[in-house]
């Protein structure tokens, strides 16, 4: 049975297939296309909107064993990997080469899954999202056709951008099997800082000025007082208080990292920031960011026996969040149907408010099952019709991850 932490409805596939190569995926899809069998791709199972849930049964196509790093081009700063390679596995391989792949959603996702959901992470403010860091793809279409998109170059002005079409398609247009990624050199120095405020407004105003000032912050995250209280207890951050908090990371030379931190401290002080603590030791930096990545478990531990629903939206940074504007919420509630209904209603209110502010229904979690109802409001009927036409053209029998993104997409029995 497949379900995730925030989508309690479980569905069982009729079979699970473990793929090891693009050719195996192509053979499977050719067969499934001919016999109208649904196929739902599975990577590490870390998605939060029900993407890997096989709502119509069929095949759960597990790509986790397609985990080979195929080629690293040090001089060109790019790498080719199979879809089942995880982010930590890749960076572990690259470390001794002085290179790294920057997109960091927190969970140890597969690269294929990160492409499928158009993932980003805590350092998107400097390095961008998967959209900016994927150079090319190999994918298998619904009928088994193998297609290559993009390449190894940083830009191209030829033809439609099929790479960006597949990134964020959540396995509904094709199964991504290989990815060409952009790499970066490991910075000479890294520093982290934490600063606490008496108000959310002070923290947000600080970030707006930091970004407008051109300070090249590598990561920047805002944590509210309630989450800080949970993280202090869970991650033993005894020197911290339960206050609105900004977390920073700076990359560059030793001199530039120190200068960035000094500039950020001066700005935060002007907005009521206090106790700006700067650290360059790896142990201190890692502890700080691990606490951020453990926020989900900290929140759960703060309310034993409660269920949790996590959601994300994105808004302009002036409207209340920082960095790239991604806004994450964890809703904790008693494990009863009535409380669950209230949690879902609150989620809808949050998304509606984000759209009213010029934002989007999701910044990085994707659409899956949970955000389908908001696509028309966010994109409009003509754009939604274009999406539907693309889906019908590439997957006319609706076998690829049916029920996801579009409410009225073709189904496998159509």
Give the predicted meaning of each segment.
Residues 1-414:
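Noncatalytic alpha-helical scaffold of FAD-dependent oxidoreductases
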């Amino acid at each position: 049975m497949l379900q995730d932490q925030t989508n309690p409805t479980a569905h069982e596939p009729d079979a699970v297939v473990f793929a090891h190569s693009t050719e195996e995926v192509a053979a499977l899809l050719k067969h499934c296309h001919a016999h109208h069998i649904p196929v739902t791709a599975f990577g590490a199972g870390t998605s939060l909107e029900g993407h890997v849930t096989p709502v119509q049964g069929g095949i759960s196509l597990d790509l986790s064993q397609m985990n080979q790093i195929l080629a690293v081009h040090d001089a060109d700063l790019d790498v080719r990997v199979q879809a089942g390679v995880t982010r930590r596995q890749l960076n572990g391989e690259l470390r001794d080469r002085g290179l790294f792949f920057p997109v960091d959603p927190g969970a140890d996702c597969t690269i294929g899954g990160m492409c499928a959901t158009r993932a980003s992470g805590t350092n998107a403010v400097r390095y961008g999202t998967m959209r900016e860091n994927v150079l090319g793809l190999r994918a298998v279409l619904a009928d088994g056709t193998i297609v290559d998109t993009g390449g190894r170059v940083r830009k191209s002005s030829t033809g439609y951008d099929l790479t960006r079409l597949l990134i964020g398609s959540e396995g509904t247009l094709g199964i991504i099997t290989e990815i060409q990624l952009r790499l970066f050199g490991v910075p000479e120095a890294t520093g982290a800082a934490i600063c606490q405020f008496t108000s959310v407004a002070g923290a947000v105003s600080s970030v707006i000025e930091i970004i407008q000032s051109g300070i090249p912050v590598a990561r920047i995250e805002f944590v509210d007082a309630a989450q800080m209280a949970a993280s202090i207890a869970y991650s033993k951050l005894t020197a911290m208080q339960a206050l609105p908090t900004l977390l920073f990371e700076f990359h560059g030379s030793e001199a530039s990292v120190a200068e960035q931190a000094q500039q950020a401290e001066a700005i935060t002080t002007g907005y009521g920031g206090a106790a700006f603590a700067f650290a360059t030791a790896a142990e201190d930096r890692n502890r700080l960011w691990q606490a951020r990545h453990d926020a989900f478990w900290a929140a759960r531990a703060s309310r034993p026996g409660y269920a949790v629903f996590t959601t994300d939206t994105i808004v302009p940074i002036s409207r209340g969040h920082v960095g790239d504007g991604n806004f994450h919420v964890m809703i904790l509630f008693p494990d009863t149907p009535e409380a669950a209904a209230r949690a879902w209603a609150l989620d809808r209110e949050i998304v509606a408010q984000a759209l009213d502010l010029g934002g989007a229904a999701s910044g990085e979690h994707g659409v899956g099952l949970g955000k389908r109802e908001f696509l028309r409001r966010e994109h409009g009927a003509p754009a939604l019709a274009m999406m539907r036409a693309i889906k019908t053209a590439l997957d006319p029998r609706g076998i690829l991850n049916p029920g996801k993104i579009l409410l009225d997409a073709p189904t496998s029995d159509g």
